[in-house]
Each structure stands twice: as structure tokens, then as C-alpha cells.
């Protein structure tokens, strides 16, 4: 039996990031760093980090996001959900970097071509930010279809992802749990 995991489907055009959107992102990063500096206890802002998925679950989640192409990233716009909590973690993890270097760290990772109107880090191959630079929301979020899969992951040995929205449908290859990944979620 093949389990079907249904996810949304993004259908947007890729474009070079418009200057005004990049400028808005830079202003947002500056504000987030200022908010961090104004915090009484910046260490208390750091959120617990969501562990990266492993095993068959990681395979299915990666295929789900790739098949969807990042519908959930659309809301990231010019802020990428980054705020003073994200900056607190980034500052803690990179104590040798000053504010300008952190802003440069982000700007250097902009997608050369991002989906129109979506997060500026939402490139053709997914997020151009590594997990340590992403907002915790981005590391922790899964759409309903993927969240439902995670709840029943141990019962699924064969899965196919179906991304559908407004008459568009994309399917992944059938994913099969290997003996090596058996027992891993």
C-alpha cells in the first residue's frame, strides 16, 4: 500500500530580487538587530531549536517540500520571519560578527532568483539560508499534509507526495523506507 501525502503546490514565477524588496529586507534586519540590542535579557529571547528530521521522515519531508516548491515560504516576503529572537541565536552562534557582518551574512545568501512575491531566500532549489540562519518558525513548520505524515510515519513504508492547487498537480516518485531507515522516524 502506498500512502499518499497531499501538500499545496506553489505556481509562481522566478525573478531576480527587486532592489526595493532587498532594501526592505535590509531595513528589517537592521530593525531586528536594534530590537535585540534594546532587549533587557537577549539570552532569554533565544528559542529552543527544532531538531532536523532524520531517516525516512527526512526523505519524505524533503520530497514534500520539493514537490510543493515552497507554498509556505510565500508569507516570508521581505522579512523571512526573522526577528530579534532569530538575531539573538545568530549573535550567540557567531560572537565574532558585528551587526554589519550579520546583515552581510544574510544579504550574501539572497536567492539569485526567488519566487515572485515570496520570501527573498526562497530560491529555485529551496531556502538559500541554512537552518542556523532561518527563523525558528521556518525550521519547525510543516504543512498539514506533512504534519499528518509525521504523526503516522512509523506506519508508512511507501509514500508518494501529491502537490495540488488550482488545477495544478505534481507527484513525487514513490518513496520507499529502506531496512537501514526502518525504526527511524
Model-derived features: where do they sit?
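Hydrophobic scaffolds flanking metal-cofactor catalytic centers in soluble metalloenzymes
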Residues: 2-185
Amino acid at each position: 500500500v502506498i500512502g499518499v501525502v497531499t501538500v499545496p503546490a506553489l505556481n509562481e514565477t522566478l525573478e531576480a530580487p527587486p532592489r526595493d524588496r532587498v532594501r526592505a529586507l535590509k531595513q528589517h534586519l537592521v530593525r531586528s538587530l536594534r530590537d535585540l540590542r534594546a532587549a533587557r535579557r537577549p539570552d532569554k529571547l533565544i528559542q529552543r531549536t527544532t531538531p532536523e528530521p532524520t531517516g525516512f521522515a527526512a526523505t519524505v519531508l524533503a520530497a514534500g517540500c520539493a514537490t510543493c516548491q515552497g507554498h509556505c515560504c510565500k508569507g516570508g516576503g521581505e522579512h523571512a520571519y526573522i526577528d530579534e529572537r532569530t538575531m539573538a541565536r545568530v549573535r550567540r552562534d557567531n560572537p565574532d560578527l558585528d551587526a554589519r557582518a550579520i546583515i552581510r551574512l544574510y544579504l550574501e545568501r539572497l536567492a539569485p532568483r526567488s519566487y515572485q512575491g515570496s520570501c527573498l531566500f526562497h530560491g529555485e532549489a529551496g531556502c538559500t539560508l541554512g537552518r542556523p540562519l532561518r527563523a525558528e518558525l521556518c525550521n519547525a513548520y510543516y504543512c498539514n499534509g506533512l504534519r499528518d505524515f509525521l504523526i503516522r510515519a512509523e506506519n508508512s513504508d511507501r509514500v508518494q507526495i501529491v502537490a495540488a492547487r488550482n488545477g495544478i498537480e505534481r507527484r513525487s516518485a514513490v518513496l520507499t523506507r529502506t531496512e537501514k531507515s526502518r525504526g527511524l522516524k
